[in-house]
A protein has these predicted regions:
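Anion-binding alpha/beta catalytic cores of soluble intermediary-metabolism enzymes, centered on
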Residues: 1-179
């Protein structure tokens, strides 16, 4: 429910184009008070692009032993379908994790998008913007939190890498100047 409300609010504010994955009738029935105008809802199982995405997944994973039948079944899963949409260039980003475990969120990304060369580990971050614009800890009100939960026992080098990666992401995505 909170994901659907957030999607509707994002579209209403004209922040982004949103695509929800799931059964449109089920999503509407579970969220009768949410105006889904402008929110695209795609059912992976019934999508005309399912076979195209399954073929893409098969090509990427056949060396690991995946069969075309396994690729088709796997592509029906929302985390894989969304990641395949991203790989195919049909969407610009993917938000997952509210309804899926970290492992089930990351696995498709690592298998389909893959790690760039020279990137030694997966890390994450989030931004928090203080409502009044600032406080005693941060004059502009923007906070960057790096989540080391993906790397349970990082050494000093890994911690430094995580901090630099979060700072670069904040600069790229939000035009912040981390310090």
């Amino acid at each position: 429910e909170r994901v659907v409300k957030a999607a509707a609010d994002t579209v209403k504010r004209k922040i982004a184009r949103i695509v929800l994955l799931g059964d449109p009738d089920e999503i509407a029935a579970k969220n009768p008070d949410v105006d889904l105008t402008g929110v695209e809802i795609i059912n992976p199982v019934k999508s005309p692009k399912l076979q195209e995405y399954a073929d893409l997944l098969y090509e990427l994973r056949k060396a690991k032993g995946m069969t075309p039948e396994q690729a088709l079944e796997t592509a029906k899963e929302s985390t894989y379908f969304g990641t395949l949409m991203l790989k195919a260039g049909d969407v610009d980003g993917l938000v997952s994790g509210a309804c899926h475990s970290t492992a089930n969120t990351l696995r498709p990304g690592l298998q389909i998008i893959k790690m760039p060369k020279g990137v030694p580990l997966v890390s994450s971050f989030f931004l928090m913007i203080a409502p009044e614009g600032g406080n005693q800890y941060c004059k502009d009100g923007a906070f960057i939190f790096s989540d080391c939960g993906l790397e349970p026992n990082p050494d000093a080098d890994k911690l430094a890498y995580i901090a630099v990666a979060a700072a670069k992401s904040a600069k790229t995505l939000a035009d912040l100047d981390p310090r």
